């Protein structure tokens, strides 16, 4: 037999084997509380409160009562048998209690209970325990001679157990505040190292290393009354660390505002803030992205070559509108390219139609042009690959042609040699200035004058330029200087 709050109660094993005798009368009705100890469902609550009820409640139309014996206050009292413990009702014979005709309960042992008087509706306990009224209320005995039977802590424990029983009888979930008892007086709990003695009770406060300073564990040991053990972990009143909304995301903005979304199952944050705590990946950039980036750069360069640019020196006109560009050989004018090639293939036929004086000059021109054929082909290929160079070159040509005046224009003679009747071949042979004088070449009806606004070497498809003409063709007018001509041909070759 153990003690709870100074009141003995029977163990579970004893009560499980005990058979409760019901009264012979139909009026007696007994409600057995499960083994005198309320055990909550572990699956639903998972919390057990330490302690038990030191008294039972009997529902009966008559004023029935159950009082457990207390042998600690009366050492001469022997413990009764298990078959006669815990409960008694009207009409049940028991060695502890006797029922009088006026329904007042007296004890067979002298000195424990006194009659409540005839017609009394309550049981008056002479020993300083408590009294139960007909309404079910429990009141403390006010016997000043015997003194207080319960301490303040014991009385609060009885009140808590009575409230738990009311919730259970009403089939209502018991609040967690009642299941986990906390001391109501926190004034003496501020210092955990202080041992206090209050009403015969020792209160020991122990701190654990793995708990915060605001958490403390109370161990209350009742020594004077035979003892009750109460264990519980409580937090101080000033520290409210409990999360009132555990289903809510715990991500805050650093101040007082909190995310309103629900957390992911088994997580602390919502879907939006779950990635905040994850480490960021350091993936390398894929090669496909790099290749596409280079391709974009190349296409951008090609697009810039196709843009129409304007220059202020040409009065805001686009380059494509300048007439000098149409005379330049480029990739877009294959006729000029083939015309230059035909000039080399049919040079013999063209020279045969000229007079002897003109043939000598043309042969010198053709000799130098053969050596420059490779450079001419390279120039065409270079212009096909880089069309921007053609545009810049055309801009320079237009600038030179606009800056020149009619007095300084150079006159050139362009010979048009007709080959076969089915194919017309035009070869422009340019004769430029040599020594500041105007060269005049005698010819036949095949030559004609063509005047341009710019230098003749810019419009001619014949390679060589003004340098080849000045070195070779300029000395052809002096027939006596044969050595000079030969040296010019050797230098040009």
Swiss-Prot record:
Record GO terms (molecular function): ATP binding
Q: Name one GO biological process term.
A: leaf development
Q: Where is the WRC domain?
A: 243-287
Please indicate if the UniProt record lists Transcription regulation as a keyword: yes
Q: What are the alphabetically sorted keywords of the record?
A: Activator, Nucleus, Transcription, Transcription regulation
Tissue-specific expression: Predominantly expressed in shoot tips and flowers.
Segments of this protein annotated with the region Disordered: 270-302
Q: Name one Pfam family in it.
A: QLQ
> Is Nucleotidyltransferase set as a keyword in this record?
no
Write down the PANTHER family for this protein, in alphabetical order: GROWTH-REGULATING FACTOR 5, GROWTH-REGULATING FACTOR 8
Please give the family membership noted in the entry: Belongs to the GRF family.
What does the UniProt entry state concerning the protein's domains?
A: The QLQ domain and WRC domain may be involved in protein-protein interaction and DNA-binding, respectively.
Protein's name according to its UniProt entry: Growth-regulating factor 8
Annotated source species = Arabidopsis thaliana (Mouse-ear cress)
Please spell out the taxonomic lineage of the organism that makes this protein: Eukaryota, Viridiplantae, Streptophyta, Embryophyta, Tracheophyta
Report which gene this protein is encoded by.
GRF8
């Amino acid at each position: 037999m153990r003690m709870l709050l100074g009141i003995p109660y029977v163990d579970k094993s004893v009560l499980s084997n005990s058979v409760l005798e019901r009264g012979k009368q139909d009026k007696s009705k007994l409600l057995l509380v499960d083994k005198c100890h309320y055990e909550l469902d572990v699956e639903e609550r998972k919390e057990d409160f330490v302690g038990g009820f030191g008294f039972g409640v009997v529902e009966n139309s008559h004023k029935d009562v159950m009082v457990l014996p207390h042998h600690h206050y009366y050492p001469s009292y022997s413990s009764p048998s298990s078959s006669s413990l815990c409960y008694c009702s009207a009409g049940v014979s028991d060695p502890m209690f006797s029922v009088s005709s006026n329904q007042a309960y007296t004890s067979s042992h002298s000195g424990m209970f006194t009659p409540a008087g005839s017609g009394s509706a309550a049981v008056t306990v002479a020993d300083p325990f408590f009294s139960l009224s007909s309404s079910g209320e429990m009141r403390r005995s006010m016997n000043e001679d015997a003194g207080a039977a319960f301490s303040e802590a014991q009385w609060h424990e009885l009140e808590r157990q009575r409230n738990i029983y009311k919730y259970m009888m009403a089939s209502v979930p018991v609040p967690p505040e009642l299941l986990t008892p906390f001391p109501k007086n926190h004034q003496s709990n501020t210092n955990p190292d202080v041992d206090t003695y209050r009403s015969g009770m020792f209160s020991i406060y122990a701190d654990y290393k793995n708990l915060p300073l605001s958490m403390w564990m109370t161990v209350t040991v009742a020594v004077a009354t035979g003892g009750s053990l109460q264990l519980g972990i409580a937090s101080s009143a000033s520290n409210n660390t409990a999360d009132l909304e555990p289903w809510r995301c715990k991500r805050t903005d650093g101040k007082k505002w909190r995310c309103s979304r629900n957390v992911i199952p088994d997580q602390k944050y919502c879907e939006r803030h779950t990635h905040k705590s994850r480490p960021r990946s350091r993936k390398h950039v894929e090669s496909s992205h790099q290749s596409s980036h280079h391709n974009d750069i190349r296409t951008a360069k090609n697009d810039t070559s196709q843009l129409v640019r304007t220059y202020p020196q040409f009065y805001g006109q686009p380059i494509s509108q300048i007439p000098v560009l149409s005379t330049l050989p480029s990739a877009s004018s294959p006729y000029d390219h083939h015309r230059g090639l035909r000039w080399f293939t049919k040079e013999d036929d063209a020279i045969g139609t000229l007079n002897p004086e003109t043939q000598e000059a043309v042969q010198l021109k053709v000799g130098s042009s053969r050596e420059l054929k490779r450079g001419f082909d390279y120039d065409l290929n270079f212009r096909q690959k880089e069309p921007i160079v053609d545009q810049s070159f055309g801009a320079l040509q237009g600038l030179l042609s606009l800056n020149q005046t009619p007095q300084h224009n150079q006159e050139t003679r362009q010979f048009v040699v007709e080959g076969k009747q089915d194919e017309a071949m035009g070869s422009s042979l340019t004769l430029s200035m040599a020594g500041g004088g105007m060269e005049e070449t005698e010819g036949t009806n095949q030559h004609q004058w063509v005047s341009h606004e710019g230098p003749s070497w810019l419009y001619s498809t014949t390679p060589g330029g003004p340098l080849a003409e000045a070195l070779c063709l300029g000395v052809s007018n002096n027939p006596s200087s044969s050595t000079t001509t030969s040296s010019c041909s050797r230098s040009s070759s």
